């Protein structure tokens, strides 16, 4: 029996589990299923990978499915400072999209894109087809430890406001402790996945219920969605398979470059510079 949920209805997903219990495999399963379903014009990924190696396989589909900051070489973000810039750029993208929706008189991205494809919106006024953007963060705890509030604020903003304009967040973390998954973040991530965690407290933090500490491991998971908790076995997508899928997509003709996010200028850094020099 397959369990399939639309990410757009979720609208954001929080995953937690101890090391080696299938979190990264679960992420890969989600990413690959999205790659299968959507055309590059409909979907872009922003991949944040503090571990540096987990998501590097997706580098070959940069010109098809990835989004990045202007002027960056790497489309997969591993550096904490760049993560902060990217999150803020996503917030700018969100505000821009809301302006477009307001102009078009639409309430969500689906209505907007339907209107646009029906040629009811003028591209000369800046209207364009808006792809879904999925932000994937593979080790959230690491970001919070190194950047703290700077990361948490934009993520909380995106989680609160970005669902209507097609920006969705998938966040994975090893340590679901209270100082990492704060109340603000929990409130905005109604869909949660827990792989095996080390203690009952961790299970309560992520699912608001015990049970995740008794899972077997190896992709055995609890999904909390719509107020119900379901026990599932996560599909196993190994590295060669992800590689093959990415390779296949990468060999097709893509766009000239990755999807560019708006430019973000850090005001604090601007103050430090002297423009006359």
Features from the language model and the residues they span:
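P-loop NTPase catalytic phosphate-binding loop
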Residues: 1-107, 125, 130-197, 201-215, ...
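Residues that form generic nucleotide/phosphate-binding pockets
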Residues: 93, 115, 206, 245-248
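Short glycine-rich substrate-engagement loop in P-loop NTPases that contacts/grips substrate
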Residues: 106-117
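Alpha-helix initiation and N-capping motif
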Residues: 109, 200, 239-242
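Short, P/G- and charge-enriched loop/turn segments at secondary-structure junctions
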Residues: 120-124
């Amino acid at each position: 029996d397959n369990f399939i949920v639309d990410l757009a209805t979720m609208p954001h997903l929080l995953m937690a589990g101890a090391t080696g219990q299938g979190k990264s495999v679960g992420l890969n399963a989600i990413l690959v299923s999205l790659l299968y379903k959507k055309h590059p014009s409909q979907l872009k990924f922003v991949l944040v990978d503090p571990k540096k190696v987990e998501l590097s396989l997706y580098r070959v589909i940069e010109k098809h499915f990835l989004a990045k900051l202007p002027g960056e070489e790497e489309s997969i973000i591993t550096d904490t400072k760049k993560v902060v810039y990217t999150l803020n750029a996503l917030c700018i993208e969100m505000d821009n999209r809301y302006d477009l929706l307001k102009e078009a008189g639409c309430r969500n991205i689906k209505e907007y894109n339907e209107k646009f494809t029906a040629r009811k919106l003028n591209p000369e006024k800046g209207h364009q087809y808006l792809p879904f953007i999925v932000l994937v963060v593979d080790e959230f705890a690491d970001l919070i430890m190194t950047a703290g509030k700077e990361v948490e604020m934009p993520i909380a903003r995106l989680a609160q406001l970005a669902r209507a304009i097609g920006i969705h967040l998938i966040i994975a973390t090893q340590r679901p402790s209270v100082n990492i998954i704060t109340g603000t973040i929990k409130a905005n991530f109604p869909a949660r996945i827990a792989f095996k965690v080390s203690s009952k407290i961790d299970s309560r933090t992520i699912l608001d219920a015990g049970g995740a500490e008794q899972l077997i491991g190896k992709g055995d998971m609890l999904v909390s969605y719509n107020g119900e908790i379901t026990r599932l076995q996560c599909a196993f997508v190994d590295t060669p398979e992800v590689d093959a899928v990415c390779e296949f997509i990468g060999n097709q003709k893509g766009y000239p470059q990755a999807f560019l996010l708006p430019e973000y200028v850090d005001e604090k850094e601007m103050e430090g510079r002297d423009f006359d020099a």
